[in-house]
């Protein structure tokens, strides 16, 4: 039987599991203290936990299902990690240094099926969801990386915007949030956590009904159905009308601000016409709408797309502001490394594929 990651258990699930296996309820407090406060890397280091409990945990769980493969460090402090999972799949995690602290962007799926035509993440289709433990471990690996360098820094913010669609892996993502937000866990404040979705309308409604104060971001990227469908396949299933119905429910239920992500593609969605359409689309909820204009990171496989000029981005920004929409032009991170989400993973898989083909050719020649 393959053991699962101990990091995948929420506080409630760990407590229930320990009690079901004859352990005292307070053992959960001890175990989580070792995992998230002292941040040990083996069960054996949990010195105040009885041997019987240690043996039970060791027999059923592991603490390291991720193996570090590549680390890229940018001159601006951004660090990109490529991890290998226990089944050999590769995922990316990114740490960004912000004025307000350290932010980590986590991956939730191996590959992506959303079908955004400009994105590196979808170059390889989804093969499976990540477990809650595999998502939490991304944060823990980054934190261990910081601890190992005696930097005395901690991950203070989390964005669920890496490879995959978080709401397509809903239950595992919710457990991940419960772990990192819990005051006995990583204790990352809910207002410091943002979950991004490409627009799974039913799950936006589910998310509104959760007991979280976590921020929500919508990957919108176009203000009308024709344009959005041409660059985001998901719009065929959940049109802008369906998406806005879900957003209306979310806003009325939570009264929380929503960030709308809008990637700027030269000659595609960056005209004044689209800016005016976007302002009109968000007009009803402009007091809780916040638009994040994102400079495009070119992807080798998507040669049809280029980043908008600075002049066009500024003009788009000005049009939104003049029409009462709060917005910002996102600061770029890691431009001197594989900046686009999924790009490092895609390149690594290609390299491995090339090496394997060369090995096969060499073997054939030697036969």
Swiss-Prot record:
Keyword Iron recorded: yes
Domain of life: Bacteria
One GO MF term attached to the UniProt entry: 4 iron, 4 sulfur cluster binding
Disulfide bonds: 105-341
List of residues binding [4Fe-4S] cluster: 112, 116, 119
Active site (record annotation): 92, 341
Cofactor(s) listed in the protein's UniProt record: [4Fe-4S] cluster
Keyword Transport belongs to the record: no
Subcellular location: Cytoplasm
Residues spanning the signal sequence: none
Catalysed conversion reaction: adenosine(2503) in 23S rRNA + 2 reduced [2Fe-2S]-[ferredoxin] + 2 S-adenosyl-L-methionine = 2-methyladenosine(2503) in 23S rRNA + 5'-deoxyadenosine + L-methionine + 2 oxidized [2Fe-2S]-[ferredoxin] + S-adenosyl-L-homocysteine; adenosine(37) in tRNA + 2 reduced [2Fe-2S]-[ferredoxin] + 2 S-adenosyl-L-methionine = 2-methyladenosine(37) in tRNA + 5'-deoxyadenosine + L-methionine + 2 oxidized [2Fe-2S]-[ferredoxin] + S-adenosyl-L-homocysteine
Gene3D superfamilies cross-referenced by the UniProt entry: 1.10.150.530, Aldolase class I (3.20.20.70)
Residues at which S-adenosyl-L-methionine binds: 164-165, 196, 219-221, 297
Cofactor, how bound (note): Binds 1 [4Fe-4S] cluster. The cluster is coordinated with 3 cysteines and an exchangeable S-adenosyl-L-methionine.
Known EC number: 2.1.1.192
Alphabetically ordered keywords of this record: 4Fe-4S, Cytoplasm, Disulfide bond, Iron, Iron-sulfur, Metal-binding, Methyltransferase, rRNA processing, S-adenosyl-L-methionine, Transferase, tRNA processing
Record family assignment: Belongs to the radical SAM superfamily. RlmN family.
Leftover remarks: Reaction proceeds by a ping-pong mechanism involving intermediate methylation of a conserved cysteine residue.
Protein's name according to its UniProt entry: Probable dual-specificity RNA methyltransferase RlmN
Source organism of this protein record: Listeria welshimeri serovar 6b (strain ATCC 35897 / DSM 20650 / CCUG 15529 / CIP 8149 / NCTC 11857 / SLCC 5334 / V8)
Name of the coding gene: rlmN
């Amino acid at each position: 039987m393959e053991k699962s990651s101990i990091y995948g258990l929420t506080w409630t699930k760990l407590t229930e599991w320990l009690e079901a296996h004859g352990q005292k309820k307070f053992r959960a407090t001890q175990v989580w203290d070792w995992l998230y406060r002292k941040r040990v890397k083996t069960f054996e280091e949990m010195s105040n936990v009885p041997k019987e409990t240690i043996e039970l945990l060791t027999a059923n769980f592991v603490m390291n299902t991720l193996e570090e493969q590549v680390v890229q460090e940018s001159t601006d402090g951004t660090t990109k990690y490529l991890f290998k999972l226990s089944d050999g799949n590769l995922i990316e995690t990114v740490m960004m240094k912000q004025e307000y602290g350290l932010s980590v962007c986590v991956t939730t799926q191996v590959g992506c099926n959303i079908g955004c035509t400009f994105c590196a993440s979808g170059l390889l289709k989804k093969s499976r969801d990540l477990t809650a433990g595999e998502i939490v471990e991304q944060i823990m690996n980054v934190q261990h990386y910081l601890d190992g360098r005696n930097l005395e820094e901690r991950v203070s913010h989390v964005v669920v915007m890496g490879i995959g669609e978080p709401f397509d892996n809903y239950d595992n993502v919710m457990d991940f949030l419960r772990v990192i937000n819990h005051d006995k866990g990583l204790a990352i404040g809910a207002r410091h956590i943002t979950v991004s979705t490409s627009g799974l309308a039913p799950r936006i409604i589910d998310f509104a009904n959760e007991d979280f104060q976590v921020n929500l971001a919508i990957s919108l990227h176009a203000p009308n159905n024709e344009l959005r469908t041409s660059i985001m396949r998901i719009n065929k299933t959940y049109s802008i009308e369906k998406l806005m119905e879900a957003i209306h429910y979310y806003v009325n239920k939570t009264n929380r601000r929503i960030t709308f992500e809008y990637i700027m593609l030269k000659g595609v969605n960056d005209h004044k016409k689209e800016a005016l359409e976007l302002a009109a689309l968000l007009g009803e909820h402009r007091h809780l709408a916040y638009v994040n204009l994102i400079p495009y990171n070119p992807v080798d496989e998507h040669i049809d797309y280029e980043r908008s000029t600075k002049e066009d981005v500024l003009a788009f920004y000005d049009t939104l502001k003049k029409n009462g929409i709060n917005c910002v032009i996102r600061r770029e991170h890691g431009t001197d490394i594989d900046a686009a989400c999924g790009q490092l993973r895609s390149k690594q898989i290609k390299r491995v594929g090339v090496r394997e083909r060369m090995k096969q050719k060499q073997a054939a020649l030697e036969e």
